[in-house]
């Protein structure tokens, strides 16, 4: 068996959530780029280009945003099912608004995907 090369200066904590590590690196640079850029790619106006950069920035901000709005209190208990596995049962007194939570999560996911697609599509335009 071939011995794996050891990579120096890479910490496990930086790789366990690589998406967040990359976002933390890219986000401040994108903000600086937006502030300093005075050029824009062919096919864009300066307003369209800055709007595109804003959507990209928003995607990376949302990746790093751990805050969740209050959707109520999720209460549940566990019961053993007939097949021997434990299952979670939502308590009837739970005030958690599952529909609002799923809508919020879906909206966030759509914005992240849109921004990351714009990032990929315009990666080679990130210069001035």
Please identify what each model-predicted range represents.
Residues 1-125:
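Long, non-globular targeting/processing and low-complexity regions
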């Amino acid at each position: 068996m071939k011995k794996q090369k050891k990579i120096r200066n890479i910490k496990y904590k930086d790789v366990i959530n690589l998406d967040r590590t990359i976002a933390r690196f890219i986000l401040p640079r994108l903000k600086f780029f937006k502030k300093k850029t005075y050029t824009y790619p062919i096919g864009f106006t300066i307003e369209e280009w800055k709007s595109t950069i804003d959507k990209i920035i928003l995607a990376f901000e949302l990746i790093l945003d751990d805050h969740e709005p209050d959707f109520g209190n999720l209460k549940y208990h566990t019961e053993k099912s007939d097949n021997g596995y434990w299952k979670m049962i939502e308590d009837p007194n739970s005030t958690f608004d599952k529909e609002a939570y799923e809508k919020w999560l879906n909206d966030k996911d759509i914005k992240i995907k849109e921004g990351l697609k714009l990032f990929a599509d315009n990666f080679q335009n990130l210069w001035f």
